[in-house]
Amino acid sequence: MPDYLKLKKSNCKNCYKCIRHCPVKSIKFQSDQAHIVKDECVLCGQCFVVCPQNAKEIRNDVPSVQAMLNSGSRVVVSLAPSFVANYPGATIDTMKAALQKLGFNAVEETAVGASIVKTEYEKIIAERRQKVIISTCCHSVNTMIQKYYPEALPYLAPVLSPMQAHCKRIKEQDPEAKTVFIGPCISKKAECDESP
């Protein structure tokens, strides 16, 4: 697993908060430093949230996005609706304007994908294909089931996440477009890498 989330050596103060809050216990402590056990991590971000020393670092994808913007390709943003939590007073229109000033060609809400996904869930329920359905919208949950609860794999809905559904729709409408997802979730980085 690439370094989506890593720990900065100099900042760790041995408080063990990350270890206590990790739902899958994928953090070990060695040589006065916390280390993420990559093969066990589900990228939920709890360690990042609870660290009082800012000792966690999330992979920076800005250089890759800048390269896309500089390539001359059409670049479309899929914007998670949670942006309103980080930018009080912002609307989709103000976000579109700001992102287009940065060079993006278009900005759409990931909610477009959520609508597609909702329709798929309705079909599964109406056709009674599965008695028990676990939503596949959260990549961390999907990863946790794959790694720790494989007996629950048959219950995962065979449906794309809203992000994937939206980006697929964008590429169907504009096959040459490159897509960039902007949202708060660390595990979405892995999801993007696993399903380009």
Regions found by a protein language model. Give the residues of each.
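Iron-sulfur-associated redox domains of electron-transfer enzymes in respiratory
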Residues: R59-P196
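Iron-sulfur cluster-binding cysteine motifs and their immediate structural context
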Residues: P2-K9, K13-V37, V42, Q46-V62
